[in-house]
């Protein structure tokens, strides 16, 4: 039995294209892997806090007492990291907002990137500590960006996930959804076909 963690990050709730793909992924995964456990976390509701000057102090060990806000952020960080490490497959819904990932997803990454816990520095450079995982990224876009300089999402996620130790990453794209109903429908159909292949692998 595998444990699957699904991370939603769209601010559009039920109108989200990436959310629809995520729901389809969950439906197909449950059908093909009936014994697996699926956990869904919506990073936009409630939103993950922004890592600001106060909260960054909570992520670095020190002797100074933590403020209540820092204590809450540290507790959430611990919870998110424990959840991440406890799952085998990580599904990330990453719609493109202004060429990059949503703020909500970036805030999540800022809270789980902690030296000595999800990565460490060695004489040979950084080493990821979140190993043995498989990641699937579902990315919806209004335009066509795959394999072009305007796709900042795929390179960034490959680097970040690899940095914490997740190197087995598959991408599913739904592109051109702002180009009209026909293009959007084909994009969704193609993405669902790609999801079928990922689920069956």
UniProtKB/Swiss-Prot annotation:
EC identifiers of the protein: 1.6.5.-, 1.7.1.17
Residues that coordinate or bind FMN: 10, 16-18, 96-99, 140-143
Catalytic activity: 2 a quinone + NADH + H(+) = 2 a 1,4-benzosemiquinone + NAD(+); N,N-dimethyl-1,4-phenylenediamine + anthranilate + 2 NAD(+) = 2-(4-dimethylaminophenyl)diazenylbenzoate + 2 NADH + 2 H(+)
GO function terms (MF aspect): electron transfer activity; FMN binding; oxidoreductase activity, acting on NAD(P)H as acceptor; oxidoreductase activity, acting on NAD(P)H, quinone or similar compound as acceptor
Protein keywords: Flavoprotein, FMN, NAD, Oxidoreductase
Xref: HAMAP family: Azoreductase_type1 (MF_01216)
UniProt name for this protein: FMN-dependent NADH:quinone oxidoreductase
Species annotation: Salmonella choleraesuis (strain SC-B67)
The encoding gene: azoR
């Amino acid at each position: 039995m595998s444990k699957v963690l699904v991370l939603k990050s769209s601010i559009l709730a039920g109108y989200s294209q990436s959310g629809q793909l995520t729901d389809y992924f969950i439906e197909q995964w449950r059908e093909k892997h009936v014994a697996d456990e699926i956990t869904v976390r919506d990073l936009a509701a409630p939103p993950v806090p922004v890592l600001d000057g106060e909260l960054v102090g909570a992520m670095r060990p020190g002797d100074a007492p933590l403020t209540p806000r820092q204590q809450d952020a540290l507790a959430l960080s611990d919870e998110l990291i424990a959840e991440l490490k406890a799952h085998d497959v990580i599904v990330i819904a990453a719609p493109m907002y202004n060429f990059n990932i949503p703020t909500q997803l970036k805030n999540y990454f800022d809270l789980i990137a902690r030296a000595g816990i999800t990565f460490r520095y060695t004489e040979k450079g950084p080493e990821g500590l979140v190993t043995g995982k498989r990641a699937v990224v579902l990315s919806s876009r209004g335009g066509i960006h795959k394999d072009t300089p305007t796709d900042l999402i795929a390179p960034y996620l490959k680097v970040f996930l690899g940095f914490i130790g997740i190197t087995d990453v598959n991408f599913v794209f739904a592109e051109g959804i702002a180009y009209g109903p026909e293009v959007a429908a084909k994009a969704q159909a193609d993405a669902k076909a790609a999801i079928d292949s990922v689920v069956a692998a």
